[in-house]
Regions:
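Nucleic-acid substrate recognition interfaces
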Residues: 1-379
Length: 379
């Protein structure tokens, strides 16, 4: 069995009195995080044991935090610093600006009688919730809750709950279908599978919408006003949410639209940013900021849910190699009109489809090298 963790976002319903208690708790928790962050930045001490020994009493007395809340503050700050060190490889002090509150399951929050019981500085409050689309995760014989995060977005309160559950691990010997997936801008994905069927998800409308976002961003950047900066930030967040939703839809369609025990083959796009930064300036925004990685991560965990697997392969020549005769030549591909024409045998097709076909073939070779029985239809 293999464990999968997803985040369930559950909206909770709070009365005006509850909101006051929640806001106060979130604000104090945030202040405590900044206090601990200052100390960690000065000392570079990331050991919870020593932080607890030095700062625990202060958090209890100065911020009136309960025991578990104080421990959660240490964990929140330590996790933020570790993320920064992994990504930046240097000590940068994080600032906790937005009120937040991390809640430990069965200590700071629990689920009873169709309500979440949430701990605050002034005792527990019981909060009803909207269960649409989330109720299946509340079966604790299957799903386990982790440390949740309480957030306030535009006056609405949400619990972001990590939910862990087990699925049957995909065994390579069970593979019955291979899908090559070429990711790009003209087509978000082009696919080719074991039934020799091709599929495309057009990126035209997405590209146009992102171009509109880019133009609006440039206009706002020229104004240099506080309101324009606020709107710039809001637009960036809106665009990210929209693109993540697109990737969610595409990855879900790929994972559920294919049978269980499918092997998805992707190009390993590590270092793609360095490549795309050499494109024309007018095309650079779309190329560099395109969220290939987000789509990849969503497909990986959705594939696991369907007892399928994802592998990444060397992307070199996937759009230059003829799937019919194997002839590889750069001039086989005409990027301007997205057409592939083999200089050796004359085979012609869309260049993104060619990429998907070659990725499919690499998946077949991967299975052959792994000595998997003939469970996949090949050409």
């Amino acid at each position: 069995m293999e464990q999968i963790t997803i985040t369930a976002k559950v909206q909770i319903v709070a009365t005006d009195t509850d909101k006051v208690l929640l806001n106060k708790t979130m604000s104090v928790y945030c202040d405590a995080c900044n206090y601990v962050s200052d100390y960690v930045f000065r000392t570079h001490d990331l050991k919870q044991f020593s932080l607890n020994k030095i700062l625990y009493s202060t958090l209890r007395e100065k911020f009136s935090l309960k025991s578990q809340m104080a421990q959660s503050v240490f964990k929140t700050v330590i996790a933020r610093y570790k993320t920064i060190l992994e990504n930046q490889n240097e000590w940068i002090k994080p600032s906790f600006k937005k009120p937040q509150y991390d809640l430990v399951w069965n200590r700071d929050y629990s689920l009873t009688q169709n309500c979440f019981s949430v701990n605050t500085l002034n005792g527990r409050v019981k909060l009803p919730y909207f269960a649409e689309g989330m109720s299946k995760y509340f079966n604790h014989s299957i799903y386990r809750f982790g440390t949740a995060k309480l957030v306030n977005k535009h006056g609405k309160y949400y619990l972001h709950i990590p939910v862990t559950y087990e699925v049957e691990e995909s065994n390579i010997s069970d593979i019955c279908n291979v899908v090559g997936i070429d990711r790009g801008i003209n087509f978000v994905v082009a696919t080719y599978d074991s039934k020799h069927k091709s599929g495309f998800v057009s990126g035209k409308a997405i590209k146009q919408k992102r171009a509109n976002y880019s133009r609006l961003r440039k206009e706002l950047q020229m104004r240099h006003t506080p309101s324009s900066r606020r709107r710039l930030k809001a637009i960036g967040q809106r665009e990210n949410r929209w693109m993540q939703d697109i990737n969610h839809q595409v990855s879900k369609a790929l994972a559920t639209g294919n049978p269980k025990h499918t092997l998805f083959v992707l190009e390993d796009l590590t270092g793609i940013r360095n490549v795309t930064e050499r494109v024309k300036t007018k095309d650079r925004y779309v190329s560099v900021s395109w969220s290939f990685y987000d789509l990849e991560q969503k497909l990986i965990y959705k594939a696991k849910q369907n007892q399928s697997s994802v592998i990444k392969v060397d992307p070199r020549h996937t759009s230059q190699c003829c799937p019919a005769c194997g002839h590889t030549e750069k001039s086989n591909r005409n990027k301007k009109i997205h057409l592939f024409t083999c200089k050796n045998c004359g085979y012609t097709s869309n260049d993104d489809r060619i990429g998907a076909m070659n990725l499919y073939r690499m998946g077949i070779n991967y299975l052959a090298d792994s000595q998997v029985p003939n469970t996949v239809v090949t050409e």
